[in-house]
């Protein structure tokens, strides 16, 4: 390289001979043409690094494509009828031609450009010559730097823990794009480093084994057995702040670690994810030496555990929770992957090709992958553990045929040798395991005798036999764990009822959201209701977001992210959801769950209500119920869900569920707002649906060759006509919409006042002036103190006097009611004893 460099310098010095001392002057920036010359190179076709095109085997003959070659990343320019190939990447050029020769050609072209410009501006040409000289020197230094840099990887190279060189290259390829296979990898220049690197994958691991003295988690050590968690897991639990295991975790983790099949039941929000996640992680760590040996032999490892979830959102949530725990273990970054619908199947195939340790999947997408790849089926069939999260869905007939097909494929393709046990370990978890909870609430079904243990899993042979028929447990009888045998709904959830008419749900929902600040999750039975409630609440200046099954996966995840951000910024944030968000989702800091419609079955109600009061916190579950629902479905729901303390006696619904206190003077002031907001929301939905129908009808008419659309009215069904007329009746013009929006804006600008007849701030029972000064007044209701739904329902509501002092209400009325109830119970028991 040195002789060529001297030639370049000599050439540049010639142009410098007649130059005066201008080195100290400011240099001008290079022209666009000079920049293009430096960035790109013109090469010949035979100098390019062509790739051979692989012709598919299904072609009988080559059809003129024999020896076809291709290349990408090269620009073609036609100059004087000839094609010139312009290259910006040196990898696209064969190594036969030296880089020094290419630089000389570029320098000659740049010198020619400079000579052509010298006649016009000689002074600028001298500056540019000086600039070219320094650029050439810089290019020489860069070439020398590149030669020193790309001599291979040193021993001190930092490799991401738990990953091979191939994994790192795969990630680089995905970030940069498609890489030419004919270009030799850079690290091949020093093969001895590659061999050493592949033999010592975890030699430079950042995961130093934590010191046992630094970890103080005595509650996680099981004194009854010799089982103990690894330091990696204990370190992760310590960092996450999980000092004590929950009851379900304390009972199931030792059993699962012994390799037993486990069926676990616990209330919502009790930590079931870690109850099965920790045993899988411990199993992976115990097999770490075998996993590393397989990596050195270029063998793809089979997964340690496969977790099946009923919904996509739950699968992504499980991955997030397990990653937060496994972050402090040797499990690689791609060691836990989610395989769900709605996302790129090619990316999921690539993730599975790396042999992840834990797979969290929905049955539909993973079945699609298994049917495409037989090798993948054999590898996944070798798994050690299979987990069913929210497994109560399997008890319902007609659900999850895909899951049963997956199990059949695993049984047929599981290796039959001494290396693998003949059957995998099965872990089953859910919050509901009673068949009575799955019946429709609006249908009259035969009354089943309630078990003496209520909803307890222990001794429930019917559920156990049903699970065994579908799952084929490894053990003759799996270990049954019921952390809450007497609880169906979590004791931290306060249930409430709002009695309203069928057409007044919007009004009372708005009242609830306005009065009680916080993040609220509203469930509706239909997707149309979800779509209507979002614009309705947005019109009332309440941030609302929607999630339902008709949305694609990215839209659902984006809606959840926006809701969480809105709940952090604003006092009130609402997520309107269908039952797709009812199971398993752990959305942080949900204060209230509102049932806009009464759920269709009791198990859905349990899982809906379980979205609040998670991880030991308290929450409120409110039902908006019409008189028609109260007479039938609500009574049946309360009979199934009520605490076991009321068994054997007559169910008093008002004692079981508390009525939410409603102030009718405030409701009457909110009604005009709700009417206008509802009209605007209905108009938006009607306009959108009618526009879609019209476009569909026009497209169908064009395909049928019908010119006059009125001819299609004769073939339209009567029901469709009624629906169309109903939608058209809700449509309004643009001027009417503007008028309604202006009217609603005026109403929202006016404050709601308690006891509106008062004219002075200091008059009445509430001292408004004192509330405004101290900041204890309600933000949206003048003359009303701040309220909390949990305190109001638990009887902690306080009365504030004119001076602002707090006084507790008397409890004599409550004590009288309790005494009367006790007398009635004793009289009833005496009568039953006399009859016997």
Swiss-Prot record:
Region listing for Disordered, in residue ranges: 1-49, 89-160, 792-836
Organism superkingdom: Eukaryota
Main location: nucleus
Listed GO CC annotations: cytosol; nucleolus
Pfam families: DEAD (PF00270), Helicase_C (PF00271)
Catalytic reaction equation(s): ATP + H2O = ADP + phosphate + H(+)
Boundaries of every Helicase C-terminal domain copy: 508-665
GO molecular function: ATP binding; ATP hydrolysis activity; RNA binding; RNA helicase activity
Domain topic, free-text comment: The Q motif is unique to and characteristic of the DEAD box family of RNA helicases and controls ATP binding and hydrolysis.
Protein name, as recorded: ATP-dependent RNA helicase MAK5
Lineage: Eukaryota, Fungi, Dikarya, Ascomycota, Saccharomycotina
